[in-house]
């Protein structure tokens, strides 16, 4: 694949322009956190040298990490100085053994605020914001000045994305056959992406998807639908975006559904688009605008309903189109849905059972991706943004219809 889901800087939106950054920094997607140690060596020359881009000879030791695409993603085991500033994380993205991009994260708002809060719990949010802005301004200024010295030219303004809501603007410096792309979003992150100029794109769609006409895309999605002997009809190939401890269920599930459709914007990039300022709250976010924009960037049609409609949903799922549902959540019901994924029969939809459904408006909200159904048993099959163990959960359609309050149907 031409590039991997990225994010950085405002948890950057990506494009083949910003490739190689895994979905969630700090291990939220991949499990255990890997923290490279900081060193004072300068790796700048090594990362832009011909030996790296022609012979695939990268400096230092790199650790392979899982990726959502077919690319190989590696993280550098140290944080050196690059273009005048210490890095926070450095990633390399390779396709079939060929280096495609190097992404350097300098500053991440989530990591910054988490670390400061842990080390100094008495520090108030206003002083933290002032400290972050000061750090942000220093890093941005240093990087741009150093890049100007290297390239001996001013940057060109560029962008990726078709919608005002998710479009990201960058400063591109040209250095031989390479583009050095600075992504700096005040209030979020700062990163630098190094790539071949020939790989620059203005769309978030994967290179493969962008080459297909809609009829071909629909055919590919249809081929992901599998019918099993027990009557289950399921969509295969929807990736897992783990939300970790953040209030990202609506964002992670959107990312899962749209990545499946060919969009290469991860949860963090979408969070930035939804105006998530910091990681501990979804307050003030513009979620409905985000869903509409993500669908448009996916070159897909989004139709929104209120309560889940089982009859309508079947028509979408049979064609390989995913559905995201916002619903009210109950821990007790969740245990039943988990058990059903392991083969335990769901309780019958009796009056006594219905009493336990979380239908109250003050019940916690949650988002799930509907991936299949069984018409014979009247069950829906769904997944959560909690990890691979949260796939193939089951719920009676009546329960989902009663507990849902927004449904998003995607189609090509």
Question: Could you describe each region identified by the protein language model?
Answer:
Residues 1-20:
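Classical Sec-dependent N-terminal signal peptides that target proteins to the secretory pathway
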Residues 18-64, 167-296, 361:
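Active-site-adjacent structural segments surrounding the nucleophilic cysteine of cysteine proteases
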Residues 21, 70-161, 340-342:
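Long, charged/polar, surface-exposed segments that mediate recognition or autoinhibition
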Residues 142-149, 255-264, 293-297, 315-320, ...:
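Structured segments of extracytoplasmic/periplasmic soluble domains
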Residues 154-155, 264-271, 301-312:
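Surface-exposed patches in mature extracellular/periplasmic domains of secreted proteins
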Residues 184-186, 190-230, 348-362, 369-412:
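Noncatalytic regulatory segments and standalone regulatory/sensor domains
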Residues 244-247, 256, 277-281, 308-310, ...:
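Solvent-exposed loop/turn segments at secondary-structure junctions
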Residues 309-383:
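Active-site-adjacent substructure of cysteine-protease-like catalytic cores
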